Design a protein with these regions (language model features):
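Amphipathic alpha-helical coiled-coil segments that mediate homodimerization
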Residues: 1-4, 130
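Regulatory sensory and allosteric helical modules in signal-transduction proteins
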Residues: 3-77
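Short loop/turn segments at strand-loop or loop-helix junctions that form parts
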Residues: 7, 80-81, 110-112
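Generic domain-boundary/flexible-linker signal
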Residues: 13-15, 87, 119-121
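Surface-exposed beta-strand edges and their flanking turn/coil or helix-capping segments
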Residues: 31-35, 67-70, 91-92, 119-125, ...
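Helix-to-coil/beta transition segments that act as allosteric "coupling" elements at the rims
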Residues: 63-103
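Juxtadomain coupling helices with adjacent low-complexity linkers
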Residues: 100-155
């Protein structure tokens, strides 16, 4: 499965994500924001600890956290969608990368119910190409990606 999760940073203290696109049907749990701090993959990307998240066996990853009620996946790859536009022009949140801040506006997520399904050397670079294309689309059509405020405020 593939999904795009928009970063919401309404109050700057509790950044969260909201699923805005999925390869399968959106579930009810996708219709409300999930705090980034409670999701190991998003938190590690936002903190700059990793540039992408790759895990072929989530069940055996120590202290893995996810706010997805019924996760249903065993393997996952997550890429940040990074834009090149000025930070003040973007909705989103920012991760320290050592040389300044990088705007993370969304996450591209790929997961599978099968453990060990992904090949890091092949799939991670391919995902970066898709993530970069999403970032260019986001820069060009920001309003297309803006979440429905009624969904966000019903939290």
């Amino acid at each position: 499965r593939a999904s795009v999760k928009q970063v919401l940073n309404v109050d700057k203290r509790t950044p969260s994500v909201l699923a805005i696109a999925r390869s399968d049907r959106l579930k009810d749990s996708d219709r409300h924001p999930h705090e980034i701090a409670n999701n190991t993959d998003f938190a590690s990307l936002l903190s700059g600890e990793r540039s992408s998240w790759f895990c072929n066996d989530i069940d055996n990853y120590p202290h893995y956290k996810s706010t997805s009620v019924s996760r249903g996946y065993k393997s996952t790859i997550v890429w940040p969608v990074l834009t090149r536009v000025a930070a003040e022009d973007l909705m989103g949140t920012f991760a320290e990368d050592g040389a300044g801040y990088k705007p993370i506006v969304a996450f591209l997520c790929l997961d599978s119910a099968v453990p060990g399904i992904f090949n890091e050397e092949q799939h991670v670079p391919l995902g970066w190409a898709v993530s970069d294309a999403l970032a260019r689309l986001y820069e060009a059509q920001r309003s297309f990606w803006e979440p429905d405020i009624s969904i966000e405020s019903s939290k």
